[in-house]
């Protein structure tokens, strides 16, 4: 079984919706890292000219490769990543190997058999 890691940088108010969307699309769980900060091309400024950095959450999803594209696209739609600037981004990278997921592998095999 091969895995991908989806890393989503999400506005903190959208984290729960993105997590639910990932589960609906086939993810079996996730890890959330709270209070990340970042900015895009343009800095967010307040009316006093100060820089305003919005809080983000980092959502990590270790998913089976055959489900990965669908999960990535679904969280992008729900999070409105392409529709509104600054709402978030998600990337997907290959995972060479993983340990500690034997209990999820059996469940994933059943999900894959149903969906493929």
Which residues make up each language-model segment?
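Positively charged, small/polar-rich N-terminal and surface patches that mediate targeting and assembly
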Residues: 1-116
């Amino acid at each position: 079984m091969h895995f991908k890691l989806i890393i989503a940088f999400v506005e903190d108010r959208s984290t729960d919706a993105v997590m639910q969307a990932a589960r609906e699309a086939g993810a079996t769980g996730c890890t959330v890292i709270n209070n990340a900060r970042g900015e895009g091309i343009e800095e967010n400024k307040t009316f006093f000219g100060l820089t305003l950095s919005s809080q983000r959450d980092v959502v990590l999803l270790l998913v089976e490769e055959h489900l990965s594209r669908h999960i990535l696209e679904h969280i992008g739609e729900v999070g409105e990543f392409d529709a509104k600037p600054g709402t978030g981004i998600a990337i997907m990278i290959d995972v060479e190997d993983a340990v500690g997921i034997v209990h999820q592998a059996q469940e994933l095999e059943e999900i894959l058999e149903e969906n493929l």
